[in-house]
């Protein structure tokens, strides 16, 4: 239910933007089916899997497993896309970034409870794989479609799928009562769904699937540094080392190959 509300707030930002830029939902049946596939693979399915999985494993392990998204994308794109083959430089950069995520989040793996249920681990890994398939699918099947249209159509359809699933997964649906909860959902929807999806689909069009999914490496850095800045959490050597590994990995994986002379 909360994920459905979050996407609803995201639509409040995306629909006016689509209208102002003249982007209407297409009537072509084949294109609509592709957008529906993108909505399920990139939003509805991983949201449901992560929401379920994180009730059974620790947040640190969930962040590490979610960090496998670029690695899955690297493999899938190699076989699906002609212009995104595995190279030693790209593979090394992604592996280095993943090690950085492990270093950042390993402090949360100190207890057996953090590992949780194997099925919870499988759910989050499946979500990461779904994100990878979605990114590659968007690059292969929706290349050239405006990012505003991709974001609006996929979020609209994903929200419809989630609301249809609410009576099955959670009945009666929960309605938030606290103003702070609505404020948090609005913030997550506008920033985490509206702005994030616009940027994400722009990056897929401009950079390609593998390089676009590298943004998942940045999320743990942002969360931990916000903890330092806002919650006065200590700035540790582990945080600095993990950040340096991630930044180095991203720079290595996204650097354009040297021109041949």
Task: State where each predicted segment sits.
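Membrane-interface helix termini and inter-helical loops of multi-pass transporters
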Residues: 52-56, 105-117, 167-184, 228-237
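Hydrophobic transmembrane alpha-helices of multi-pass small-molecule transport proteins
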Residues: 14, 36, 76, 88-108, ...
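C-terminal transmembrane-helix exit sites in multi-pass transporters
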Residues: 15-25, 70-95, 221-240
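Cytoplasmic-side transmembrane-helix entry/capping segments in multi-pass membrane proteins
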Residues: 30-39, 85-98, 145-154
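Hydrophobic/small/kink-forming positions within alpha-helical transmembrane segments
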Residues: 15, 39-44, 48, 71-75, ...
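Transmembrane alpha-helical segments that form core, pore/gating elements
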Residues: 14, 73-75, 79, 94, ...
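Specific transmembrane alpha-helical segments of multi-pass solute transporters/efflux pumps
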Residues: 14-66, 102-103, 189-207
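Helix-helix packing/entry segments at the starts of transmembrane helices
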Residues: 3-5, 43, 59-68, 136-160, ...
């Amino acid at each position: 239910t909360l994920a459905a509300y979050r996407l609803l707030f995201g639509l409040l930002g995306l629909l006016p933007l689509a209208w102002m830029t003249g982007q209407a939902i297409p009537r072509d049946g084949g294109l609509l089916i592709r957008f529906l596939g993108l909505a399920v693979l990139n939003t509805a399915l991983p949201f449901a899997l992560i929401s379920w999985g994180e009730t059974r494993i620790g947040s640190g392990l969930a962040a590490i497993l979610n960090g496998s998204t670029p690695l899955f994308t690297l493999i899938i794109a190699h076989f699906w896309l002609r212009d995104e083959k595995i190279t030693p430089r790209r593979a090394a950069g992604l592996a280095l970034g993943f090690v950085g995520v492990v270093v950042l989040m390993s402090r949360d793996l100190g207890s057996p409870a953090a590992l949780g249920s194997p099925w919870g681990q499988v759910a989050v890994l499946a979500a990461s794989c779904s994100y990878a398939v979605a990114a590659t699918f968007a690059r292969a099947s929706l290349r050239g479609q405006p990012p505003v249209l991709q974001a609006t159509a996929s979020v609209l359809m994903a929200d419809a799928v989630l609301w249809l699933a609410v009576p099955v997964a959670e009945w009666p649906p929960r309605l938030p009562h606290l103003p702070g909860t609505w404020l948090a959902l609005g913030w997550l929807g506008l920033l985490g769904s509206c702005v994030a999806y616009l940027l994400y689909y722009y990056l897929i069009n401009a950079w390609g699937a593998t390089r676009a999914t590298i943004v998942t490496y940045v999320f743990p850095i942002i969360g931990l540094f916000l903890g330092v800045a806002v919650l006065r959490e200590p700035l540790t050597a582990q945080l600095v080392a993990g950040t340096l590994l991630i930044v180095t990995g991203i720079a290595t994986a996204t650097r354009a190959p040297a021109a041949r002379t």
